[in-house]
Amino acid sequence: LRVSVKIACMLKTRQLKPHIAFLASNKTTVRHRGESSKKKKKKKTKIRIAGTTQTTRCSSFFDEEEESTSPLVPTTKNTPFVEKTTPKTASILTTTTKMMQFCDIGANVVSATGDTQFDGFYHHGSKRYHESDVVDVLERAHKVGVREILATSGTLDEAKATARQCRTWNTDGGGEKNAALPKMYGTVGVHPTRAGEFNDSTKCESPEAYVDALKTVVRENADVVAAIGECGLDYDRLHFCDKETQKKYFQLQLEELAGEFELPLFLHSRNSREDFYEILKRNARHLRKGAVVHSFTGSKEEFEELLALHDKVYIGVNGCSLKTEENVEVVKSIPLDRMLLETDAPWCGVKQTHFGTKYVPEDTDRIRAVFGPPLKPKKWHKGALIKDRCEPCHIVTVCQIVAGCKGTTCEDVAAACYRNSRALFFPHKDFGE
């Protein structure tokens, strides 16, 4: 009786979960934190799916490619995970044999752009909580399948710094390709809230000179510049720049930058539906190389009229696109062949208050399973995620929510959006695949 009571107590406190998981899959080697990691060979196990028995390799969701004919992706929950920084009962192990691939089409990872969270500064404060961990951030992204990242810029100075930093990240110390990080690209353009820089004599002597300087950045950095932008209209933050100035220099960038270079557009629109659409409609010829309206939070009618402008226009979806039930219903309606995934890191993260999180219960959160729960900045340590700081690796969470609301698989969403990203930004590049 005493033994029975003890076992019952252990079950209640979940102390037996690792042992039960081990017994349930006696052909799979389960390793706890602190144990030897020398034996890395994956065992084979039989998994029954829909009345059939398949032999497959038990592997982490993010294992590298391996040949397989099975399109199904079974999962095992509550299995002890081997990473030191994750909980003992991290929840997702799967038998998928091909890692999903992503292009994060919008992330603010260059500190010169004013987004300094990856340098350890938060809430626009002067206190530094930790050393720069941006390389760790990029390595995490690569680990979960992010193959390319577009680092956005919003001014002339930012465009220069972004191009320079992307080239640095793309090579290792010996000048060879850096295989540990995603391939980094940048954008060149002026954000609508910064459009006043065209009239700032401390930046350039005239708007025309400013545009010429932007063109020079594109020409001198053709290997890393993938888009014109971030340009457009933002009527939510008119305290930064008035409507007329925004419209004037949005038009100028379309004519001078999109008109000259064979590059797609990276577009921004906030609370500006009518003016944004009318300007694009008048300049439809400049959409010939395609465009993405990033971080979309508009209505179904709004994205439908934008997609109708050109068959190379896409809609970018991130955490801000998944806040409310209405937002999620809109995303549900966006055709997969016209959708791109992004994070807009360190902003636009998926928060627990967002409606979209209903599609990512904690025990199926793949990022949390791999890297552990996020910490407060003051508790940062190397390799840690930070609470409320979005990272490019969180594109997996965005993908999970999109798949959930559309009633399809993450693999299908990732494949479609990755195909779209390459078609838009890298149509002529040979990726050696």
Please place each PLM-identified region on the residue numbering.
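Short, low-structural-confidence N-terminal segments
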Residues: 6-9, 22, 29
